[in-house]
């Protein structure tokens, strides 16, 4: 072991192959048997509460400071992965992945994934990704989600088309789509300007402390002070967009029998915190194809009548 700093690795008697650099780093690590812990902590109080967790890397002041028995985690940045009991989580950025009991989460960017608690297999990239106001909304217990950026992202660019998995061998319960021309005729295409509610929320990060002056990890979910500003149009964008209202499409979905409890509908979706609706525009393609086919059938029938 290598220890440099006040109380660094001060209670470990049997663990080995750990490195602690800084005040109170890995100060409570204590293995009762001969164990290769392979923990690395660099920065003020980084990993200070790790007891039996192994293969962890914490770099930054208070990085992983309330992590106990989690393993194979990586945290880089002040307060990153601060209170963690999960495994294989990666957090890079100030306050990223603050309190996590889930596993296999990845967060890159300041406060990315900050509100994820028990969720697993999530990916949050960019400032405030998967946090209140972001396109993915605040994710807490949800799993298998990807969030890119916050509410200020205005465009996304990639050199080639996305390839979406669609192998028939991975699908079952095939039925012919019954949404076609009638559904398309009922849609209401619109132009609009964005005036996002999230822009009227003043997100001021505050850190709460317990009676002893330590960071209150149990109250982390309230460490964001949200001050709502009047929604008066001052943040309205000056450029036009085109599309549909998600609520209108959901109404059509329900009428067609595609509303399944509170789960994601065929075309509409709801963020994990239930605060923002979205549309999966790529799924309109099969419906448009069906509508064209139905229309072509009608055209051919009329043509046949005219020619005979």
What are these regions (language model features)?
Residues 1-167:
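Glycine- and small/polar-enriched repetitive beta-structure motifs of secreted/surface proteins
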Residues 166-308:
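Intramolecular chaperone/auto-protease modules of tailspike-like proteins
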